[in-house]
From Swiss-Prot:
CDD domains assigned: DotZ
Main function: Component of the Dot/Icm type IVB secretion system (T4BSS), which is used to inject bacterial effector proteins into eukaryotic host cells. Part of a subcomplex which recruits effector proteins and delivers them to the core transmembrane subcomplex. DotY and DotZ play a role in effector translocation, but are not essential and do not influence the stability of the subcomplex main components. The DotY/DotZ main function is to optimize secretion by modulating the delivery trajectory of the IcmSW module and the localization of the machinery to the poles.
Example of a GO cellular component annotation carried by this entry: cytoplasm
Protein name in UniProt: Type 4 apparatus protein DotZ
Self-association state and partner proteins as the record states: The T4BSS is a complex nanomachine composed of several subcomplexes. This subunit is part of the Type IV Coupling Complex (T4CC), a subcomplex composed of the DotLMNYZ core and the IcmSW-LvgA adapter subunits, linked by the C-terminal tail of DotL. Six DotLMNYZ hetero-pentameric units may assemble into a hexameric nanomachine, forming an inner membrane channel for effectors to pass through. Makes significant contact with DotN and DotY, but engages weakly with DotM and DotL. DotY and DotZ are co-dependent for the assembly into the T4CC.
GO terms of biological process kind: protein transport
Transmembrane regions: none
Keyword Cytoplasm part of the UniProt annotation: yes
Subcellular location field: Cytoplasm
Superkingdom of the organism of origin: Bacteria
Amino acid sequence: MDEIKKDDELSQWLSTYGTITAERILGRYNISLPQDEILEAINIPSSFYRHLLQIPLKNVLNGIVIQQASDYHVYAQKLLIDYLLSGESSKEPDSQGAGTRESLEDERQRLVQLGDEFHKLELEQDNLIASSQASLMKISIDWNTKLETTLSKLNSLYKNTNSKIKKNAIRKALIKAFIHCDLVKDQSQKNKYQLIDKLNQTLAVSVGAELKESILTNLSELFQILEALNTKLDEFTDRTNHLSQQAKSFRTQFYEVILRIIELIKLLPEYKIDPAQDAINREPLYFDRTIGER
């Protein structure tokens, strides 16, 4: 169920923001697909390319939530700074509104502590992005190199049975096969043969058992890369999910701090929030704060 939920989240992300982000990420990995293939590559859950995008897209999504939390944090700070600059907080302890001012000071201290904890999360996000990009870049370089080697081997194999099949046709067919057959999460023999069948179906050729075995052997290096990708996905998925929960928690906590501060300020007999300045301070807050919740 967790895998389905995570995939639904990415599907919603892709449907909302289209293919541009995905194309840019694949471009960083020196992977370029024709427009008609990229839509399939990023929208079909079984696709190798969809798996490759999983962590980078999650990092982008987490980054948006973290930025929203940061915007709330900054706004809460501005509310308190304007209040402190007004001189309201320095009134005599026995003057009207003393209890409210004490509560506002408690909120200020909590906000400082929360901000320190949030900064640690921002650093954790930066480290996660750097480490995951380095690992996925290495896998992508290996994939691109081994893909070309494999295509040359397959080209030689198919030439022996059908000289009309061109290397470019094999490339397109193999990419389509890796889009439709999930060899990242399931490297069973059944799945491997399904991939070979998809490859030959796209090429519109019929091959015997011996040639199938030869094709399978020549694909072994690509299978190893997919296995390495799966290992890294397991590692980074745990980290991105943990970070996601923390980011959403901070966003909620900062939002709740804002509500409490505003309600406390309303109780003060003399100090009021400046509507004009508040409108300026609120400008960065017009976003969908349910992002990452669905």
